Structures are given as C-alpha cells and as structure tokens.
Amino acid sequence: MNETLLKCTTRHVRIFTARVENNDLVPDPDQLTLDLDPDNEFLWTESVIKEIQQRFAELVASHAGGELSDYNLRKIGSELEGTIRKLLQAGKLSYNPECRVLNYSMGLPRTPELL
C-alpha cells in the first residue's frame, strides 16, 4: 500500500511528510521535510536559515506525540510564515530584487524614507 504524502503549502513554506531521495520526495510518515522560500523571494543568510530551522524544530517538537494531520502541518507552516515576517520587519531578512516577481508579499520594505 502506498504511503500518503501530507503537505502544507504557504507562500514561503512547504512542509512534506517525506524524505528527499535523488531530488524526489518519498513519502515517510516519520520525517518532515521543509522547503523554504521556493520562489526565492528573499535573500537568506546562513544565520537566518538556522533561525528558521531552529523554529521549525521547536514547532515539530511541540507537536510530538500528537496526530500528524494536515491541520497540524498548516499550524506549523503558519507559525513559520509569522517568523519570516518578524525577521523581515527586524531587518534580518530582505527581499530579493532578482526574484521572478517582486510583489512585497509581506509588506513594503522598511526604509528610512518610509518610517
């Protein structure tokens, strides 16, 4: 019987109940895989990526022992979106001027002229 792949997809976060093998997602109910900013809307530093990964690990740990459902994955994804917004507002993260579509999905950049 094939395993069901659960997923959460938000604007900047994708979470799958899968592992990556040869660039393919293989369903795995015991593992969550995080795909961060698939459209490359932001410029990421290693420290910001680590901060997101740490928050992801905290959220997963807080749901340990609970039901693995679409709803719980969406809660984790929404929390990560909020973390991304906070990082952007704090100036730790910035929009990528080279992205395919620059739509400022999390609000206009904070610049001295706009403050």
UniProtKB/Swiss-Prot annotation:
UniProt GO molecular function: oxidoreductase activity, acting on NAD(P)H, quinone or similar compound as acceptor; quinone binding
Q: What class of enzyme is it?
A: translocase
- Tell me which EC number(s) this protein carries: 7.1.1.-
- The UniProt entry lists the main location of this chain as membrane
Q: Which domain of life is it from?
A: Bacteria
- State the UniProt keywords alphabetically: Membrane, NAD, NADP, Plastoquinone, Quinone, Thylakoid, Translocase, Transport
Write out the GO cellular component annotations: plasma membrane-derived thylakoid membrane
Q: Topology relative to the membrane, per the entry?
A: Peripheral membrane protein
Task: Give the reaction(s) catalysed.
Answer: a plastoquinone + NADH + (n+1) H(+)(in) = a plastoquinol + NAD(+) + n H(+)(out); a plastoquinone + NADPH + (n+1) H(+)(in) = a plastoquinol + NADP(+) + n H(+)(out)
Q: Name one Pfam family in it.
A: NdhM
Q: Which InterPro entries match?
A: NdhM
Tell me which family the UniProt entry assigns to this protein.
Belongs to the complex I NdhM subunit family.
Q: What does this protein do?
A: NDH-1 shuttles electrons from an unknown electron donor, via FMN and iron-sulfur (Fe-S) centers, to quinones in the respiratory and/or the photosynthetic chain. The immediate electron acceptor for the enzyme in this species is believed to be plastoquinone. Couples the redox reaction to proton translocation, and thus conserves the redox energy in a proton gradient. Cyanobacterial NDH-1 also plays a role in inorganic carbon-concentration.
User: What is annotated about its quaternary structure and interactions?
Assistant: NDH-1 can be composed of about 15 different subunits; different subcomplexes with different compositions have been identified which probably have different functions.
The protein, known as: NAD(P)H-quinone oxidoreductase subunit M
Per the UniProt entry, what species is this protein from, by scientific name?
Prochlorococcus marinus (strain MIT 9303)
